[in-house]
């Protein structure tokens, strides 16, 4: 088994990093450290890891559900955490555990029910889009994980800054300034920096961390010299397109981000207007599967 390399860490400005030191980013779940330790051992103990996962019934159930997802297309269904772990492998299992743990990391998460449902919808549509567009270097589980974590910094800022709800509303509606510039005009940081730090701390892959950090940057999508490698650009384009589909299909909260980033996303995914309309029709049944 190839040992997992430490994810490359997208650079975060030192002043900003210091300014968010007290924002209370949720700690990394212990099970993630235990899985990573096994990934880097010469003889990973899958049964031992499955036993640890089984200590948390909801975690085990979530992992089994992940393994049985149509994203993977396994010929058989997992009936236990050990079977799910064997089918998925340690790398995907580690990301799946992080995704399952994310919502539970925030006390009183019911207050953010609308946010969690939107994130789950974007993640589901992102995984589906990665399959549909057959994007080079991006697996469906990568796109799903990224879609789920992309805006996690928003929840952290909502619980840290009482005024952030209004700042967020202003950023969503601003037609001219970049989303993060609106945040930075009122706060010492923005949700992409905070979300990137959480993703790094939770040992998500470097490309996912970088895509979280730069997902509101048009320049990162289109410039030849960019902080994002091509898989990271594709991740941003996939999730932004997924968000657009969600807004079109549900009439949910509209933002100005598609006007700013949509053309670049469509170029990356080789989508014209007709293709975008077609995937919008095809995506609608998926929303009924989101819990």
What are the language-model segments listed below?
Residues 165-169:
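Helix-termination/interfacial motifs at the ends of transmembrane alpha-helices
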Residues 171-176:
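GAF sensory/regulatory domain recognition
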Residues 139-140, 206-209, 268-280:
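Short, surface-exposed acidic
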Residues 1-8, 270-291:
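Terminal targeting/low-complexity segments that flank the catalytic cores of oxidoreductases
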Residues 1-164, 177-258, 285:
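Conserved alpha-helical "signature site"
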Residues 230, 240, 266-274:
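Low-complexity, glycine/alanine/valine/leucine- and proline-rich hydrophobic stretches
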Residues 256-270:
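Short helix/strand-capping connector loops at secondary-structure junctions
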């Amino acid at each position: 088994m190839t040992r997992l390399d430490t994810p490359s860490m997208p650079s975060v400005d030192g002043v900003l990093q210091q300014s968010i030191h007290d924002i209370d980013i949720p700690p990394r779940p212990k099970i993630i450290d235990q899985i990573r330790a096994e990934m880097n051992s010469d003889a990973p103990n899958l049964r031992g890891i499955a036993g640890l996962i089984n200590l948390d019934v909801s975690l085990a159930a979530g992992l089994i559900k992940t393994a049985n997802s149509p994203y993977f297309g396994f010929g058989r269904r997992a009936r236990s955490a050990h079977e799910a772990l064997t089918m998925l492998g340690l790398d995907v299992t580690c990301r799946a555990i992080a995704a399952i743990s994310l919502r539970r990391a925030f006390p009183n998460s019911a207050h953010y029910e609308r946010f969690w449902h939107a994130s789950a919808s974007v993640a589901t549509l992102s995984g589906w889009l990665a399959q549909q567009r057959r994007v080079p270097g991006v697996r469906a589980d990568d796109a799903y994980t990224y879609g789920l974590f992309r805006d996690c910094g928003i929840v952290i800022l909502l619980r840290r800054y009482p005024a952030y709800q209004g700042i967020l509303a202003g950023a969503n509606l601003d037609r001219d300034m970049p989303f993060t510039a609106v945040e930075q005009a009122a706060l010492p940081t923005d949700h992409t920096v905070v979300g990137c730090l959480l993703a790094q701390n939770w040992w998500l892959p470097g490309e996912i961390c970088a895509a979280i950090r730069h997902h509101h940057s048009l320049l990162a999508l289109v410039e030849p010299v960019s902080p994002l490698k091509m898989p990271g650009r594709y991740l941003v384009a996939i999730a932004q397109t997924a968000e657009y589909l969600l807004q079109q299909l549900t009439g949910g909260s509209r933002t100005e981000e598609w006007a700013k980033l949509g053309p670049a996303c469509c170029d990356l995914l080789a989508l014209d207007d007709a293709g975008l309309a077609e995937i919008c029709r095809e995506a609608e049944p998926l929303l009924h599967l989101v819990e």
